[in-house]
């Protein structure tokens, strides 16, 4: 009886150790959780700029633009400054409708379908004032 109990205890400990190792491996190997990055349209200081102007994301991350100061604002992607210089991609990402109310927002989730690279965007009414931003998608 003692022998059976000892074998049973040893097997239980071995099984527990195996489950713990596999669980730890899966936790380490699981992809990072997607993040949401908020970009203010119009800086808190009152300047006509995106804040922050440069954002780096990974596939699955979301960029959310929030109307903050000095509206109206919109988000247009420059078709000559997106990966592949694709007008179709730039149009797909752009939000040409003007946002007038504080707190209005627009967001894009950069899925794995989007090519890695730098995406340049601007606010059409304030581009001449330097309201330009960049998103870098890392693969």
Swiss-Prot record:
GO terms for cellular component: plasma membrane-derived thylakoid membrane. It is a peripheral membrane protein. Its cofactor is Cu(2+). Residues 1-34 form the signal peptide. This is Plastocyanin. It is found in: Cellular thylakoid membrane. It comes from Leptolyngbya laminosa (Phormidium laminosum). Participates in electron transfer between P700 and the cytochrome b6-f complex in photosystem I. Cu cation binds at residues 73, 123, 126, 131. Transmembrane segments: none annotated. Its main location: membrane. GO terms for molecular function: copper ion binding; electron transfer activity. SUPFAM superfamilies: Cupredoxins. It comes from the Bacteria. PANTHER family: PLASTOCYANIN MAJOR ISOFORM, CHLOROPLASTIC-RELATED. The gene is petE. Keywords: Copper, Electron transport, Membrane, Metal-binding, Signal, Thylakoid, Transport. Belongs to the plastocyanin family. Residues 35-139 form the Plastocyanin-like domain.
């Amino acid at each position: 009886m003692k022998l059976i109990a000892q074998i049973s205890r040893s097997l239980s400990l071995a099984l527990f150790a195996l489950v713990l190792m596999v669980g730890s491996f899966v936790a380490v190997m699981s992809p990072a959780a997607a993040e949401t990055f908020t970009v203010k349209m119009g800086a808190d200081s009152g300047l006509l700029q995106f804040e922050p102007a440069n954002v780096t994301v990974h596939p699955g991350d979301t960029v959310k633009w929030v109307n903050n100061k000095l509206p109206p604002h919109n988000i247009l992607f420059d078709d000559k400054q997106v990966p592949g210089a694709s007008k179709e991609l730039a149009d797909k990402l752009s939000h040409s409708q003007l946002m007038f109310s504080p707190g209005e927002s627009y967001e894009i989730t950069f899925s794995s379908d989007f090519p890695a690279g730098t995406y340049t965007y601007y606010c059409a009414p304030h581009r001449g004032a330097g309201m330009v931003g960049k998103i870098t998608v890392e693969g």
